[in-house]
Amino acid sequence: MLINIEGIQAFCQTIRNPRRIIPHATFPTFSQIPCNINYFLEQKFQVPVDIRALVLDKDNCITLPNETTIAEAELKKIREFQNIYGEKNVILLSNSIGTRKLDPTGELAAHFQQKWNIPVVRHSKLKPLCTEELYTYLSNNSHVSSASQILFIGDRLLTDITLANIMGSWGVWLTRGVGNTTNMMMEVESWLYKRIHTQNPYIPTNRKS
């Protein structure tokens, strides 16, 4: 069993600053995110939005938890986003594959990347504290020049959305996901979100990370 020390640290910090888990948009599933997500966010917040890279979670976002097969509807949406943003700008950042803790040889990440043609970021720190590793990867491998040009998509408020807000990026929260699965931490996240969701989210600004 993986103990996410980084996630525990993030939870403690979130208690002091709960706005960090507030997403900029919510959708039930990944396949329901509009392809014109830039326009969607611009209309919602009335600010310019220039998203150049999408950072996807894996478990319950595009696959069932602990599996590697991408659901049909989710794969179709991935290909649509790849056509819009370019293949190298739609990447996977997961705490189950690509991490030094669970995938030390990188074999799982390499297999997933080759099978689905989706770049998988290797990182030593778990989400949400892998900001430097992620931004270094994006700076070297994508068109991103500012954290405000990144959109995070995932089903976890304390990892995916918190990471987005720490970096000064955009975050989309999937409220149901592929398998509509839940666990104790997800229930805690939902409980906390219901009590603070009326607060305004942090709005990304066009700055260097």
Curated annotation (Swiss-Prot):
SUPFAM superfamilies found in the cross-reference section: HAD-like
One Pfam family hit: PGP_phosphatase
Chief location category: mitochondrion
GO MF assignments: phosphatidylglycerophosphatase activity
Bilayer topology: Peripheral membrane protein
Short sequence motif named Phosphoryl acceptor, residue ranges: 57-61
GO CC terms of this entry: cytoplasm; mitochondrial inner membrane; mitochondrial matrix; mitochondrion
EC class: hydrolase
Keyword Cell cycle: no
Catalyzed reaction equations: a 1,2-diacyl-sn-glycero-3-phospho-(1'-sn-glycero-3'-phosphate) + H2O = a 1,2-diacyl-sn-glycero-3-phospho-(1'-sn-glycerol) + phosphate
Assigned EC number: 3.1.3.27
Record's keyword annotation contains Protein transport: no
Alphabetically ordered keywords of this record: Hydrolase, Lipid biosynthesis, Lipid metabolism, Membrane, Mitochondrion, Mitochondrion inner membrane, Phospholipid biosynthesis, Phospholipid metabolism
InterPro entries reported in the protein's UniProt record: HAD-like_sf, HAD-SF_hydro_IIIA, HAD_sf, PGP_Pase
GO biological process: cardiolipin biosynthetic process; mitochondrial membrane organization
Pathway field: Phospholipid metabolism; phosphatidylglycerol biosynthesis; phosphatidylglycerol from CDP-diacylglycerol: step 2/2
Recorded family membership: Belongs to the GEP4 family.
NCBIfam families given in the database record: HAD-SF-IIIA (TIGR01662)
Entry function: Phosphatidylglycerophosphatase involved in the biosynthesis of cardiolipin (CL), a unique dimeric phosphoglycerolipid predominantly present in mitochondrial membranes and which has important functions for cellular energy metabolism, mitochondrial dynamics and the initiation of apoptotic pathways.
Name recorded for this polypeptide: Probable phosphatidylglycerophosphatase, mitochondrial
Gene designation: gep4
